[in-house]
Amino acid sequence: MRLPVLGKDTVRMRDPEGLQDKITRIQRGGQEKLQIISDFDMTLSRFSRNGERCPTCYNIIDNSNIISDEGRKKLKCLFDIYYPLEIDPKKSIEEKYPLMVEWWSKAHDLFYEQRIQKDRLAQVVKEPQATLRDGYDLFFNNLYQREIPLFIFSAGIGDVLEEIIRQAGVFHPNTKVVSNYMDFDDNGILTGFKGDLIHTYNKNSSVLKDTEYFKEISHRTNILLLGDTLGDLTMADGVSTVENIIKIGFLNDKVEELTEQFLQSYDIVLLRDETLDVVNGILQFVTAKN
């Protein structure tokens, strides 16, 4: 029996029968064996609303009044140069990798110049009304109530990401975030970023220093992986034993050019779908017996 939610017109599947088999096996394993690994920007957060692009964690800072007009122009220039390269279907991940390092590094350098103040971040997040996808409350609350761990692996800004979820009222103890976190001095002024740089195409075990997380939940061998780029496909690399994994890709941009490429790697591809309906539908089904 196919789940009704998989009949949405935004849904594309590489192998519908194989997918249904995976869903059934995950359901049989029960919620005690399940974990969720997800990207944040444009995966848990919306790509657009009413035809307007929604901001990423970086965009929220870029467009805020804590950045000078000159700084904003420079950051917009970086976006205009590097974003088309990030999603270029003709470039390989190997070609994109150094370009993403350049982009993130240049953006971070511009942030340092702005002397960003820690105590202004909460207000900055409120201003653009950064939006989580429709159905976010059911998603976060259902996982929390069923004690299913949610691992958010983001190339965005951890401080901003956490504030968005917190202000939405769904930041629960079952949520673990690995991202680029700001480092502030004793006066609350940005001096750098902590740890290794995380960008779109190195979201794998190479930057996962805190492997204790996956050791603690090593019995959770069934995974739902949520992403919006081909770089997100490696987010489960830190999991030592995987029995079943369902990869769900949100394809937001260059849909016609990238659909086939996404279908080669993701089990489910969602075309311009601003909801978490499919994810929630699968979660409700696989946890129904529990």
Swiss-Prot record:
Predominant location category: cytoplasm
EC number annotated for this UniProt entry: 3.1.3.91, 3.1.3.5
GO biological process, one term: nucleotide metabolic process
Record: residues binding substrate: 154-155, 203
Catalytic activity: N(7)-methyl-GMP + H2O = N(7)-methylguanosine + phosphate; CMP + H2O = cytidine + phosphate; a ribonucleoside 5'-phosphate + H2O = a ribonucleoside + phosphate
Keyword terms, alphabetized: Cytoplasm, Hydrolase, Magnesium, Metal-binding, Nucleotide metabolism, Nucleotide-binding
Record-given protein name: 7-methylguanosine phosphate-specific 5'-nucleotidase B
Organism name: Xenopus laevis (African clawed frog)
Gene: Nt5c3b-b
